[in-house]
A protein has these predicted regions:
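PRPP-associated nucleotide enzymes
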Residues: 2-188
Length: 188
């Protein structure tokens, strides 16, 4: 592979980090992929780190040791969070959102990738310092948000269903007392 310019390397490093949040990526991977020395890659990473930090888009952390490397931790600055909260509140206050039963219609919001990806980054930021193994959600409406939180944390998503499907492999089932109906129900 031909030598790439610094701009090209910075773009590729940023793309790989953003597509793999909270995953440790060794410098060897970048060095081999970009056909550049580790010292050159380290200089490129400094640029990526500074720009993402300056724009409050995330942090690039260095992990020391044999299994070390760098990882990207997505984040939003406080101004961006406030703006997002305001936009979300405005959307929720739109006329016609109250449906029979005095519920708020949320489907269009819960399935909007631009909204849910931001909400996922914000929610994940509250768990970034914890040692979380999985993100768990109950099927259906919560899946997009739980997926985005799991993606931001770099961990797996577990979906709890009322009925298991044979194509999903091994399952664990529990009985629980429903808070709304007061009956014993089962979920897998």
């Amino acid at each position: 592979m031909e030598k790439l310019s610094r701009n090209n390397r910075v773009v590729i490093i940023t793309k790989i980090l953003v597509e793999n949040p909270n995953k440790v990526i060794g410098l060897n991977r970048f060095s081999e992929l970009l056909n550049a020395a580790k010292s050159t890659i380290s200089e490129d990473i400094v640029i990526v780190r500074e720009v993402l930090d300056k724009l409050d888009m995330g942090k690039v952390e260095t992990i020391s040791g044999a299994a070390g490397g760098i990882k990207f931790i997505p984040q939003m600055g406080s101004n961006a969070k406030e703006e997002f909260a305001k936009e979300l509140c405005d959307a929720l206050m739109e006329e016609g959102r109250i449906v029979p039963g005095n519920f708020i219609y949320l489907t269009d919001i819960m399935y909007n990738p631009q909204i849910i990806s931001k909400a996922g980054v914000i929610l994940a930021s509250y768990f970034k310092s914890m040692d979380v193994d999985y993100v768990v959600t109950v099927e259906t409406k919560g899946i997009p948000l739980a997926y985005e939180v799991a993606k931001s944390l770099g961990i797996e998503l577990v979906i709890i269903r009322r009925e298991n499907k044979v194509t999903e492999g091994p399952t664990v089932s529990i009985n629980y007392l429903s808070g709304t109906s007061g009956r014993i129900q089962q979920m897998s």
